C-alpha cells in the first residue's frame, strides 16, 4: 500500500482533508467567495471537496481544481456527477505549481497543500498569479501552538508560531481579511478520523494483502500524534487580499 492509497483510506470519513468541521468550511467559503458568479480555483484540490461545497452553495459559481493525483481527480469527477455539478467543474491533472489558466480567479484555495509549493509564502506567490483584481486567497497551514519538541520539528517541518506566521504573510504583501484557527476539537476529530478510518478498513479487510500494513500505519500515526505533536501543532486558515495589486 502506497502513501496515496493510505491517504485515500484515511480521509474516507473526513473528505475535507484538513482539521476543520463543516461549519468552519462553510464560513470560510462564505467569506472567501465574493459573489455567486465567481470563479474559484483550488491548487492541490485532492478529491475536490472544497470546490464541491462551493458549487453546491452557489448555483452560478464555476470552479477548477488542479492535482497531480489521477485517482483523487477521478473521485472528484464521480462526486460532481452524483451531485449534478459536473457542468461547472473543470479538473486538471498536473503539478499545481506549474498550472496556467487563460483566465483569472476571484478565489484561489490551497488548504493543507503548501508542501507542494515549497512552503506558505511560495504557495501564496503561486496563488497571486491566478488572482483577478479584488480577488482573495484562502490558504491553510500548520503552526506551532507552543514550543515543539525536536521530534515534532523533525516530523512536521520548520513551522513558526501563529504571530510569526501571520507577520510573514503580511510581509509578503498580503492583508488578512478573515481567518479561522482550528479548535482542539477540530484537530482531535481530524486525527481520530484519519487513524480510525484507516484502521477500520484494515480490520474490515483482514484477507487483503495490504491490511497489516494499513493497520500498522494507523497505529504509528496515532502514536506520533498523541506522543509527539498533539500538544504543539495548530492549524490556521487565512483569507487574504493582496495589500497592493
Descriptions of predicted regions:
Residues 18-36:
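Conserved alpha-helix/loop element of class I SAM-dependent methyltransferases that forms part
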Residues 37-46:
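Conserved class I S-adenosyl-L-methionine
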Residues 49-97:
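Class I SAM-dependent methyltransferase SAM/SAH-binding core
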Residues 97-108:
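A short acidic, Gly/Pro-enriched loop at the edge of an enzyme's catalytic core
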Residues 107-120:
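A short SAM/SAH-binding and catalytic strip from SAM-dependent methyltransferases
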Residues 121-136:
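A short glycine-rich, Lys/Arg-flanked "PGG" loop and its adjoining helix->strand segment in the class I
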Residues 139-158:
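Short, glycine-/aromatic-enriched active-site segment of Class I SAM-dependent methyltransferases
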Residues 180-245:
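Conserved Class I S-adenosyl-L-methionine
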